[in-house]
Amino acid sequence: MQVTQGDDVVGGLTKDDFVVLDENQPQPIVSFEHGDEPVNLLLLFDISGSMQKYIEQIAQTARVALDHLRPADRVAIMVFAKKTAVHQDFSDNLAESARQIGGAVKNWDVGTTTMINTAIVDAARYMQEHAGPGGRRAILILTDNLSTSFQLTDGQVIRELDKADTVLNAIVTGRAIRPDLPGPRMFPNPDYTPSNVFHLAEETGGEWVKAAQADQTFAQMIERIRTRYMLVYHEPPSQPGTFRHITVKLSNEAQKKYPSAQVHARTGYYAQ
């Protein structure tokens, strides 16, 4: 979870500055952390033709960007277009991870079209299988968001991210425009719904940013992922598989101090 005011991250908040509602019922916070837990970060790079220059920009400053991480943090790298491939397994060797980013667009035959939702689901499942217990989990996708949701709705993607306990963050390059959320008549065939990483990031409590230059934005997003808040409360009894809605907001006192603050938190979860 992240709290921002304008373009700035709001730091220094405590457990008492937050209110958590589960199906509109207040929940006591039993654990609170701010940037202390190790992070498992999966970098998910769109390597379709139009994206190569942006990955090259990131590669030039990758070592500085990954300096925002800590020694216990781990990084994995996946690439995608039509298919998805693991470029680097999870590693705590951050210098090597930075070096590997430069080669992420080479030696991979992942097709020519772009399947964003499929790639995010593959990344979520990889995270669930390989991240290991403990720590926070985050995916950072770099894409131009030019794709359709073939055979995978946003709801299905969000469910996979929820199962993997993973937050999606996005750097969206180029001239991509955020699509409207589909209404009942807008896209009669869900296979041709435009991809919407903006919506996916927001629903999982992540952040997105549009960027003409990817290198500086990459470093900023890494830092913001590293300094997120983590709140824990006990799940109320409910039928397994039921979707439960969550609202996280600042307390009245915190709202007075930060009147224009925005809380970026997941909007719900599926009961276990």
Regions found by a protein language model. Give the residues of each.
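Scaffold/interface architecture of coatomer-like assemblies
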Residues: 1-272
